[in-house]
Amino acid sequence: MMQVLLVTISLAVFPYQGSSIILESGNVNDYEVVYPQKVTALPKGAVQQPEQKYEDTMQYEFEVNGEPVVLHLEKNKILFSEDYSETHYYPDGREITTNPPVEDHCYYHGRIQNDAHSSASISACNGLKGHFKLRGEMYFIEPLKLSNSEAHAVYKYENIEKEDEIPKMCGVTQTNWESDKPIKKASQLVSTSAQFNKIFIELVIIVDHSMAKKCNSTATNTKIYEIVNSANEIFNPLNIHVTLIGVEFWCDRDLINVTSSADETLNSFGEWRASDLMTRKSHDNALLFTDMRFDLNTLGITFLAGMCQAYRSVEIVQEQGNRNFKTAVIMAHELSHNLGMYHDGKNCICNDSSCVMSPVLSDQPSKLFSNCSIHDYQRYLTRYKPKCIFNPPLRKDIVSPPVCGNEIWEEGEECDCGSPANCQNPCCDAATCKLKPGAECGNGLCCYQCKIKTAGTVCRRARDECDVPEHCTGQSAECPRDQLQQNGKPCQNNRGYCYNGDCPIMRNQCISLFGSRANVAKDSCFQENLKGSYYGYCRKENGRKIPCAPQDVKCGRLFCLNNSPRNKNPCNMHYSCMDQHKGMVDPGTKCEDGKVCNNKRQCVDVNTAYQSTTGFSQI
């Protein structure tokens, strides 16, 4: 078993508390000053690893309000993928992609000793920076910028002065699921990772021109890493793991039209991801960080339940200056919408004054999910079964040295079933993370009773007609990567064509937007898209609604019908001004026999739409 270095750091409290100070998070009106004093103590038998700058586990001892606290930290080993890349562009538009070393990084998660409900997200790159939750209260720690000093400030979130009184909103406007049964009380839905299947979101972040003007700034990278690390810590109770596989910087110009209209920008970003980014880098989800100030005080926006869909698996998040935790909460909020979670209503509760899915960002943002969010998430996984996030990264995709006992099967390990006390795998020796004598395997869909299954055995069944089954190779315990049916294959009794593993048809889009009673409106309703009016158009250019060509009317605005006896207008389906981003026909949707909608809102021949030499759709 690999030995790790245990570090103890004592934080001696300075003999005074400050009344007001300007820190990275803003003007803080009450804080404590502490001095981290690093004490290295190698456990018996441990070996120092000189090539590793940042230890895998660390422990900090300090005082908060005069009481001793022990903070245990463990490196976030799934923060980066092995093929993590960064992309910049030359002024002439040429792309340059590099793979910077990220294995020995300095981002940690943790807990407070003897506090079962505690948590922490810390950067140890230059001093200690981040936050921890102690006895239900959020504290922040960051280095004080004093010469020749190890001084740090510790303060509560409530002591950061508010920037303004204007409510900050999320741009997603849908409300609640049509519930089949009552939502459980919060006491019945205490969120722990053991309740949920582990999922991995392989994320690409795009930094737009407004935020990436200083493209060579190390501070921008640090900001992104801290935000993603904090968002991961928020998702831990739901067993959701966000792995950063790439960052792209739009240094000289934006590659889409980023405007003050959040919904227009979201549409443009989704189209760009489907037609450009997906052809260059395999990933599950893309997120745009921007400094653009959107209309209606919108902080973020996404497509509800869009995860794993080419056009809809995207979010936009407005960065909040140096308040990285606030940005992380917004990021987690929008990703949660993409995972099927709605805004909290008046009956939604968590053990905090507000919850992650509140439609308005609180002065003191919460890290807790409500009973409603847990219900929404469980229901989403059951109904939608998003394929891409159930593919864990391959062992070689997890960076940093392996740690035996963390239940992550990493490069160099034959198995990892957790600690000896908790291991329930009969094939694995928990103390060494090696297979027991006679065992051929200990993990994987192609492993049964410690033996590798024979070649040709189905290890992952096709989920639907736009998926294909995977088979064991007979050489490995791992099931091959999930493959999808060829784009353009007819599906759902010829009502649609497969597109990146989905069968997008208008009926399902109407149901997703308006509930199970909704249906597609009559063909005559789509003639409204010829007008270029408020409710009928094909696309927008510089804020102007462009009418559809006659052959493209079914690729513009989506018209749905509510099959209710009280509904007298067959073309009447209300979209508010904030709903426009979700009222368009999805790319890949069948518009005529043998034709589908492309990203330009054109109804084109299905064979032309899916011609590709790279294996990616050119729709």
Curated annotation (Swiss-Prot):
Name listed for the protein in its UniProt record: Coagulation factor X-activating enzyme heavy chain
Superkingdom of origin organism: Eukaryota
Keyword Acetylation recorded: no
Protease in keyword set: yes
GO BP annotation list: proteolysis
Enzyme Commission number(s) from the entry: 3.4.24.58
Family: Belongs to the venom metalloproteinase (M12B) family. P-III subfamily. P-IIId sub-subfamily.
Binding site for Ca(2+) 1: 403, 406, 408, 410, 413, 416
Propeptide: 21-188
Organism of origin: Daboia siamensis (Eastern Russel's viper)
Oligomer and partners: Heterotrimer; disulfide-linked. The heterotrimer consists of 1 heavy chain and 2 light chains (lectins): LC1 and LC2.
CC terms in the record's Gene Ontology section: extracellular region; plasma membrane
Binding positions (Zn(2+)): 333, 337, 343
Highest classification ranks of the organism: Eukaryota, Metazoa, Chordata, Craniata, Vertebrata
Residues bearing carbohydrate: 216, 257, 351, 371
SMART domains: ACR, DISIN
Cofactor binding comment, as recorded: Binds 1 zinc ion per subunit.
Main location: secreted
